């Protein structure tokens, strides 16, 4: 069955939802799903409706094949030690996609949530420093932050006009700092994906949150709290985990004998327990996660980032420093795509290079105590 959708009607519906958000500064799951739906059909003239799998975007498998090709090419050009490390990581993570406490993350996120709770405790103490680290965001007109007494938090970003809103309010489970950091991650992911959208992609946001951290860590390190480095380490590991899990999925796809809808569906179910009913939604969001990394060189940047985080987690300081030096160049190129030159930025160099020496001491201490 083929449904003919009116683009004018779709745009009208989407505009009405966006006006509702702007007026009420709030949206729920229904609005999120509606906006997601309208965006998914906006650029398709013919939408094929199937009972099991409605609204599959055209070109999805083609995009997966392209990513698979670039992944293999980038992998073949990696240094041997990084290639071995990466293969070990993706194989180890093959069955742990839905388990945040599985190896190698059980030391990072213990089952009693001590690290996470400590992170929030530190975050509460530095809430007053929000304006400091957001100054850079303001000056580059990436996002406008508005503190509202509301029951939820979300990010709206108008990519083409380079403006948007982040709404957040602290509650018993979180803090202004942690919410805003998360929502700003959404704003960066939305900008890099080039969409004029009003909904969030969690996988993308968690992945890019690592780059937001270079603006926030300075103020964490300035505090005298005994556990002042833990929130930084937690965020590094969360971003690393999301990145390497994405690579693990891509690695499985790249090793399929024949990349087609059925083979990818079967692989996702067997390895990651993705139900057939969620196949379209999961796969489209996975594609979006890698939208920026559509060249062999850029996939190489992601390898470098994962290598540096793996070395840091293992306490391999020599390898960590080597990988980090490559990652600095990667992050600066990432920000250049946003029109921000941070390669010569004092703030960037101070936080990402000098302050990581303090972070290394904490990691060494943690590994010694094991």
Predicted regions and their residues:
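Contiguous, non-catalytic segments that form substrate-binding/exosite surfaces or channel walls
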Residues: 44-165, 352-366
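Short pre-active-site segment immediately N-terminal to the catalytic Zn-binding motif
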Residues: 161-181
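C-terminal, non-catalytic "cap/extension" segments appended to globular domains
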Residues: 66-79, 94, 263-370
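Post-HExxH zinc-binding segment in Zn-dependent metallohydrolases
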Residues: 199-242, 300, 304, 338-341
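Active-site His/Glu-centered metal-binding helix of metallohydrolases
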Residues: 180, 184-188, 208, 299
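N-terminal helix-rich structural modules
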Residues: 1-81
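Long, amphipathic alpha-helical stalk/connector segments used for oligomerization, subunit docking
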Residues: 221-293
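Catalytic Zn2+-binding segment of zinc metalloproteases
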Residues: 185-197, 215
């Amino acid at each position: 069955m083929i449904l003919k959708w009116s683009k004018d009607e779709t745009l009208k519906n989407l505009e009405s939802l966006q006006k509702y958000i702007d007026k009420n500064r709030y949206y729920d799951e229904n609005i999120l799903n509606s906006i997601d739906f309208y965006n998914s059909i906006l650029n398709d003239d013919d939408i094929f409706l199937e009972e099991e799998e409605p609204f599959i975007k055209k070109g999805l498998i083609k995009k997966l094949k392209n990513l698979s090709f670039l992944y293999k090419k980038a992998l073949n050009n990696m240094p041997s030690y990084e290639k071995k490390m990466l293969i070990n990581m993706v194989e180890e993570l093959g069955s742990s996609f839905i388990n945040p406490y599985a190896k190698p993350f059980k030391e990072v996120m213990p089952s009693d949530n001590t690290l996470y709770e400590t992170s929030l405790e530190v975050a509460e103490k530095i809430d007053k420093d929000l304006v400091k680290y957001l100054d850079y965001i303001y000056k580059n007109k990436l996002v406008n932050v508005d503190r509202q007494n509301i029951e939820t938090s979300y990010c709206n970003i108008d990519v083409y006009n380079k403006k948007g809103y982040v709404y957040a309010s602290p509650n018993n489970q979180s803090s202004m700092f942690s919410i805003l950091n998360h929502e700003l991650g959404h704003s960066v992911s939305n900008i890099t994906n080039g969409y004029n959208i009003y909904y969030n992609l969690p996988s993308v946001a968690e992945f890019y949150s690592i780059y937001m951290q270079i603006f926030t860590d300075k103020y964490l390190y300035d505090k005298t709290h005994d556990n002042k480095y833990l929130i930084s380490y937690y965020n590094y590991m969360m971003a690393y985990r999301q990145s390497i899990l994405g690579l693990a999925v891509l690695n499985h796809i790249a090793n399929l004998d024949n990349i087609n809808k059925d083979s990818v569906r079967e692989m996702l179910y067997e390895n990651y327990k993705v139900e057939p009913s969620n196949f379209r939604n999961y796969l489209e969001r996975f594609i979006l996660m890698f939208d920026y990394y559509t060249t062999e060189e850029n996939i190489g940047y992601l390898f470098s980032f994962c290598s540096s985080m793996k070395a840091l987690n293992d306490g391999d300081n020599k390898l960590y420093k080597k990988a980090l030096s490559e990652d600095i160049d990667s992050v600066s190129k990432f920000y250049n795509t946003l029109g921000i030159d941070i390669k010569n930025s004092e703030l960037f160099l101070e936080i990402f290079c000098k302050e990581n020496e303090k972070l290394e001491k904490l990691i060494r201490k943690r590994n010694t105590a094991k």
